[in-house]
């Protein structure tokens, strides 16, 4: 049995095959995901698993150089935004790098999300609890 954090085979495979600047979207239960997009659906019930727990698990195995958020999160869901930014600060300390943070309109976020290597759907039922993680290199 795998010893490290992520036990989900699909998610572990996607992370292992990501290269520099590849994107991985972690989203709430409501983000539209095109049929042709590689979707790793972790949603079990409302809130399970939650967005931040999935982000923390993914960040334990993925070196992150940049994140993209929908700018609407600032006004509509500032609680999740602040919690997410705290997690990003913790990741920066662990990785010993600065993670670039970019805010874009939600419609543009959906377009960029469609370009990601995969979308990880959580059970989060909180508006704009979505992030695109861009892979960096740990050297």
Swiss-Prot record:
As recorded in UniProt, coiled-coil segments are none
Q: Which GO terms describe its biological process?
A: D-ribose catabolic process
Q: Which Gene Ontology terms cover its molecular function?
A: D-ribose pyranase activity; intramolecular lyase activity; monosaccharide binding
* Localization terms from the record: Cytoplasm
Q: Partners and quaternary state?
A: Homodecamer.
Against NCBIfam families, the record matches this protein to: PRK11797.1
The protein in question is named D-ribose pyranase
Q: Which organism is it from?
A: Glaesserella parasuis serovar 5 (strain SH0165) (Haemophilus parasuis)
